[in-house]
Amino acid sequence: MAREVLSGVLVEVLDSQVAAAAAGKKMNEVINAAKNVMGGVHFFVIVDTLKYLVNGGRVPKVAGWAESLLNIKPIIMLKNGEAHSVARARTYLSAVKQIMELSKNRIVKGLPLHVAVIHAAETEKAEELKNRIASSFDCAELMITDFTPVIGAHTGPGVIGLAFYCGE
């Protein structure tokens, strides 16, 4: 849309903000920096309930019914815009331990670690996860933020995520 309205102007859509822009870099340098970061981002999400994903048609009713009956917390990895189920846990704390372990296995030693804890109406759990991350990893950057309303509408309240990348 912006490309159509602003013909003759370079318009590049990015899913993240970039520190390079604040550093006064040229547009192509900002775009390259953002693309480099996006390719290295690891993103794990703990879904509290599949109810909202079932209602939205993203998960079959049978799967949602079985997992809710057993109170299973699915762990989803988002990579390159696609969601993949990577684990399941019986409790929230078990799910947290699993995403911490999954993250630990992907952290590149010697590079700065940038981490975001992302949540939908779970401020307390987000703080607890942030504290656990801070005590387990040497983070160059560690923040808490909210999921967008669009994600919250699909997953419902209670979803919590951990996103990170290693690098400058």
Positions of predicted regions on the chain:
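Mixed-charge interfacial surface used for oligomerization/domain docking
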Residues: 4-168
